[in-house]
Amino acid sequence: MKRILLALLRVYKIALSPYLGSQCRFLPTCSDYARDAIVHHGAARGSWMAACRLCRCHPFAQGGYDPVPGTEADTPVHAATGHAPVAIRLPRP
């Protein structure tokens, strides 16, 4: 099922997306978000996450950066160093 969904997304990106133009207010785009969600969370949960994202993507949405939860893109990165913050555990006194 996962391969079928990913193939359908590929067909959409190749056949329809160029004619519709870039209308997504989010980064990554909704189709990239759907692909990442299906790859990282499976067909059922990834499809649900993609459907919820499509409901958030409308002309009145503010948009912005909205990565798939639980992926590396979801990890905050320090702007100056490019490294993700690391929690350090100190020994208790």
Curated annotation (Swiss-Prot):
InterPro entries: Membr_insert_effic_factor_YidD
Organism: Cupriavidus taiwanensis (strain DSM 17343 / BCRC 17206 / CCUG 44338 / CIP 107171 / LMG 19424 / R1)
Keyword match Zinc: no
Membrane topology annotation: Peripheral membrane protein
Membrane found in the keyword field: yes
Similarity comment: family membership: Belongs to the UPF0161 family.
Compartment(s): Cell inner membrane
GO CC annotation terms, alphabetical: plasma membrane
Name by which UniProt lists this protein: Putative membrane protein insertion efficiency factor
